Amino acid sequence: GYGDRNFLRF
């Protein structure tokens, strides 16, 4: 999900 990608982004 978007939240997962957001976490991986940082």
From Swiss-Prot:
Superkingdom per UniProt: Eukaryota
Residues bearing the modification Phenylalanine amide: F10
Family: Belongs to the FARP (FMRFamide related peptide) family.
Entry's localization field: Secreted
GO process terms (BP): neuropeptide signaling pathway
Alphabetically ordered keywords of this record: Amidation, Neuropeptide, Secreted
Origin organism lineage: Eukaryota, Metazoa, Ecdysozoa, Arthropoda, Crustacea
GO cellular component: extracellular region
Keyword Methyltransferase: no
Main location: secreted
Protein name: FMRFamide-like neuropeptide FLP7
